[in-house]
Amino acid sequence: MKFPESLKGLKILVLGGGISGNSALNFLISEKAQPILCDQNQPERTVVPFFPDNIPPQSLPEVSLVIKSPGILPTHPILSYAADKKIPVVSEIDLGRYFFKGKIIGITGTDGKSTTTSLIAHLLKESFPDLKEGGNLGIPFTSFCKESISLAVLELSSYQLEDSSPLHLDVSVFLNLASDHLERHKTMENYFQAKLKIADLSNSNHTLIVSEKIKERILNSISYQCKLLSFGKTSDSNAFLDENSLKIKTSKFVYDISKFYLPGTHNRENLAASILAAEEIGGKPESIQTRIPLFRGLPHRFQIAGEKLGISFINDSKSTNLHSMLAGMATWKNIDQTCLILGGRPKQEDLKPLYNFLIRGIGCVVLFGEARATWESGIKNIIGEKLYCVENLNDTFEIFKKGNIFPVPGLNKDIIIRLSDSISISSFVFSPACASFDQYKNFEERGNHFLSLVNDFLDQIDS
């Protein structure tokens, strides 16, 4: 849609509060609009009119525009009413895009969006010192869209993209696609098309960066005029990841990634995508190379939660689907001495990849939360007595506390934790592969709880 030159005096409905909705409200107030908030929960204090979101749409004041928060389902009655009345519905990202005057890099994909968003911003900090990162990462676009900055790096979820008009970004990155959010999108094709809205396909000045697999899909079925670049492990990729030499090769530079901090092929592929995006927007290769070893990643993403006497704990609470968990574990060593902690609210996913991974010989699995109802029998059929089922994370650590501690022969003071006669563990990986909402507000709260339990557990181990 075409936004009016000024929002002053316009009555605008913000459907859904939360981080993006509240940011949109604040922006509209600053622009002297007359916003109205419609949400499930009434805020304790608000300076704008409030209506519950289950109000009959006909009872709402007449408005010129609806701004939809990403968590609101497309089937919401107010949205149907708006469509009937031909009232435009836009996203918070749409609103910010209209008012932002700088360049934009957008990042989407099933997994790795947040890390890649922060990584691109990190690589470009010398070339664009005033840049800002945000979007689905937690900093709403409308909180800084009118600032005079040269570059915004935005994480964009499928929900945000589904709700948005064409965003006309300068560079778009589509990292990967795996089964997720099908309770919302219903089919993988719908999910793919929502993600693909990040691309300005008909604009020859736009650059779209994709994985090799997504490039193949686009070449086979989609018409485009934009610049299409790929990253991956084949030599004809525009950013070729050479795992043997630990180099990433583009047409402009050969990058040494031997000192890149984040482990795993999936993180190195995200780095390849990030390098392409940084080059395309005008980043200097020498500056990008200098900054590669300095990036330390984000919390709750295969983060070292604690180490002591050879025992290690990994916090990967951001793993909310099987694709993410399996990517992280793909290059994990000493699988037979690893305890994998799974659980939460499972998504609509094929469990065969999980079973194939477990067949490799996992040390043990602890399964907690709602996932027990649908995952227990299949996992038990593969690993038998190596499966522990518990209610929650507190119970998980009670299992660990009951284990016996034994020294590892010939390795100084290193120890191993024996949970049974046949199960000895040196690494505990919390990569739930499920949503957190059965027991937590979000993956951050879940990850922080895990970190506190790790600290308590390690404090009880004598040095």
From Swiss-Prot:
Gene3D superfamilies: Mur ligase, C-terminal domain, Mur-like, catalytic domain, NAD(P)-binding Rossmann-like Domain
GO terms assigned for molecular function: ATP binding; UDP-N-acetylmuramoylalanine-D-glutamate ligase activity
Catalytic reaction equation(s): UDP-N-acetyl-alpha-D-muramoyl-L-alanine + D-glutamate + ATP = UDP-N-acetyl-alpha-D-muramoyl-L-alanyl-D-glutamate + ADP + phosphate + H(+)
EC number(s) on file: 6.3.2.9
Pathway this chain belongs to: Cell wall biogenesis; peptidoglycan biosynthesis
Biological processes per GO annotation: cell division; cell wall organization; peptidoglycan biosynthetic process; regulation of cell shape
Pfam families listed in its UniProt record: Mur_ligase_M (PF08245), MurD-like_N (PF21799)
Superkingdom field: Bacteria
Keyword vocabulary terms for this entry: ATP-binding, Cell cycle, Cell division, Cell shape, Cell wall biogenesis/degradation, Cytoplasm, Ligase, Nucleotide-binding, Peptidoglycan synthesis
Descriptive protein name: UDP-N-acetylmuramoylalanine--D-glutamate ligase
Major subcellular site: cytoplasm
Positions that bind ATP: 109-115
Its job: Cell wall formation. Catalyzes the addition of glutamate to the nucleotide precursor UDP-N-acetylmuramoyl-L-alanine (UMA).
PANTHER family, per the entry: UDP-N-ACETYLMURAMOYLALANINE--D-GLUTAMATE LIGASE
Keyword Cell cycle: yes
GO cellular component terms attached to this protein's record: cytoplasm
Coiled-coil residue spans: none
Protein family: Belongs to the MurCDEF family.
Protein location: Cytoplasm
